Amino acid sequence: METEFIYYRHTTPIGVRIEEITGYEQLSGPNWVAFAKQVFSENSKDGYRVIDHYDSGAPFLDGESSRISVSHTGHMLVVASLPKTPEVDLSIFNPRTALGVDVESSSREQVLKVRDRYLSDEELAIVPADDITANIIAWTSKEALYKAALIQGIDFRSRIRIKSLPNLNSNQTANAYVIDDDGNQIEFVLYSYESEGNIITLAISLKTATFKKRK
C-alpha cells in the first residue's frame, strides 16, 4: 500500500523547533532521504530552502542565519533549528548556536552490543545493560552532543559525557558535557521524545538561543 509523505512542525519544551518528515514507505534508502529533503525544502513560510554543508560536514540553510541540525533513520527525517543569529559564524562552534539532534528506531537492539564502545565506565553504571530504550537514549544523546560540539574526531567515551538521561514520559531534561580541544568543559542540556516508533534526542548548551523560555 502506497503512503504519502507527512510533514509535521512543532517546538519542543526546550525551545528548539523540530520539523519531521515521515511516510512514503514504498521508497527507502538514499532515494527516500532525497525526496524527504525535497519535502522539507518546499515547506517553509519564507519560500524554497536548501540544506547545504560546511567543510566540517555541519549542515546549514543556504542564505539563512539559523543554526540547524539534521538526522534520519528508516522513514523519518528530522531537522532541528534555532532562531536567526546573524551575528554568529555558524561554520564554527559558538555556545549561542550549539545544537545537535539524532534519531534512532526505538527497537534497534544493536545498541546493546556496542554500548561499551561509546559509554564510559561511569555511564555504563547509569544505563541499564538490558534496557533498550535507555541505551538508545544514551546513543542518540552522544550523537546529538557530537553534532552540537562541532569537534571532528572527538572520542565519545572520554570527552562526551552524560551525567543523566532524559525521561521520555515527561519534559524532564538531563545534563551532559563535552570537553573541547583546550580542555574546557562545555555544559549541555539533553531532551528526548518519541515519535512514530523512533527516539529523538536534542542537545543544546546552557547559552543556546532558543525560540522561547525553557521549561
Name each model feature, range by range.
Residues M1-K215:
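Core catalytic alpha/beta fold that binds nucleotide/phospho-ligands
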